[in-house]
Amino acid sequence: MQYGMDSFGLRGIPHQVFIKKKEGKIMSLAWWKRELFGGWTHFEAVWLLMFLGIQAVVFVFNPDSWLASVAAVTGILCVVFVGKGKISNYLFGLISVSLYAYVSYTFKLYGEMMLNLLVYVPVQFVGFAMWRKHMALGETAETEEVKAKALTVRQWLLVVAASVVGTSVYIEWLHHLGSALPTLDGVTVVVSIVAQVLMILRYREQWALWIVVNILTISLWAVAWFKNGETSLPLLLMYVMYLCNSVYGYINWTKLVKRHSGQ
């Protein structure tokens, strides 16, 4: 069964969350329970709790960065859920990218700000709509997971060409805007957009690009950390966790491709 989401409003509904599809069906609280807590291996559960625990420790020692910490926690939930092929990743993603856009603005990382505000925010809605049409039962039939697929060699070449052209143009624009790190910022933004498109289209190779993006973004926030102090530390650690998750995401999506090939 596939589910849709027309609203994120949850307050005032004590027993059941009603999120209607066009067909008139609803998404129950029981569905959310299965989606959020079902289908995890022991390793994945420990993996997620470890990531969240690290962010909690950072917040305890650096409470002034609470906004960045919330962005980091919801971002971690988002990418881990993407790695599992869970459609609920888009709820956490919406919260994270909205906050991250504001934090990026305060650090004058305008490329990151525009990427999150103008691309990632609307993409959460587009991605949910695209994924809901291509969901299948998971390995244990306990939860749903997205039907993943793989790029051909020709498609890979097109992805690389588009990334190179887009990066060259965007870096020039960031120079004119006075971005703090136009080259690094520009490469990160363009490759991120391409990776996001591959994610929406359910391609496994998004994770190869996310690995590149996360390495670049770690460099970007490391510079911000040295210049501006501890307020950027939660986001720096968030991208270190993203990098680890990207490797695991590629491995897990390879399994999804094999499991749902031909469907």
Swiss-Prot record:
Residue spans crossing the bilayer? 41-61, 63-83, 87-107, 110-131, 156-177, 181-201, 206-226, 233-253
What molecular function does GO assign, one term? identical protein binding
Periplasmic topology: which positions?
A: 62, 108-109, 178-180, 227-232
Mind listing the GO biological process terms from this record?
protein homotrimerization
Where does it reside?
A: Cell inner membrane
Q: How does it sit in the membrane?
A: Multi-pass membrane protein
Q: Name any GO cellular component annotation.
A: membrane
Which positions bind beta-nicotinamide D-riboside? Answer: 124, 196, 210, 214, 242
Classification via Pfam families: NMN_transporter
Cytoplasmic-facing ranges: 1-40, 84-86, 132-155, 202-205, 254-263
Keyword vocabulary terms for this entry: Cell inner membrane, Cell membrane, Membrane, NAD, Transmembrane, Transmembrane helix, Transport
Stored InterPro entries: NMN_transpt_PnuC (IPR006419)
Subunit description: Homotrimer.
* Task of the protein: Required for nicotinamide riboside transport across the inner membrane.
Family listed: Belongs to the nicotinamide ribonucleoside (NR) uptake permease (TC 4.B.1) family.
Protein name, entry field: Nicotinamide riboside transporter PnuC
Tell me the organism: Neisseria mucosa (strain ATCC 25996 / DSM 4631 / NCTC 10774 / M26)
The organism's taxonomy opens as: Bacteria, Pseudomonadati, Pseudomonadota, Betaproteobacteria, Neisseriales
